[in-house]
Swiss-Prot record:
GO terms for molecular function: rRNA binding; structural constituent of ribosome. Binds directly to 23S ribosomal RNA and is necessary for the in vitro assembly process of the 50S ribosomal subunit. It is not involved in the protein synthesizing functions of that subunit. GO terms for cellular component: ribonucleoprotein complex; ribosome. It comes from Pseudoalteromonas translucida (strain TAC 125). This is Large ribosomal subunit protein bL20. The keyword Transferase does not apply. SUPFAM superfamilies: Ribosomal protein L20 (SSF74731). The gene is rplT.
Amino acid sequence: MARVKRGVVARARHKKVLKQAKGYYGARSRVYRVAFQAVTKAGQYAYRDRRAKKRTFRQLWIARINAASRQNGLSYSRFISGLKKTSVEIDRKILADIAVYDQVAFAALVEKAKEGLAAA
């Protein structure tokens, strides 16, 4: 039977993992066994947190919108309800941006929401 030489493949795989672990502390960046565990765990954290990031940012936007709408005399839930009744379709990301960078425009949106609530 022919001899199987696969050192090249193993070396390449090890190099790939160690390259991914570059910048890690101590054995995590030098020893393949430890580096493999560290890289795998880092991948799991990255996968989880890409999803968590969406939730975190939505929370931030809602907090900003709530603060700005309360300054204009309306709670967050009533503000969103009023916007829906007046069929203003601006998502929370943009609303939060408007709340932070353009208070005059946001105040106009709050007035629009108040009109929608009064009409209903």
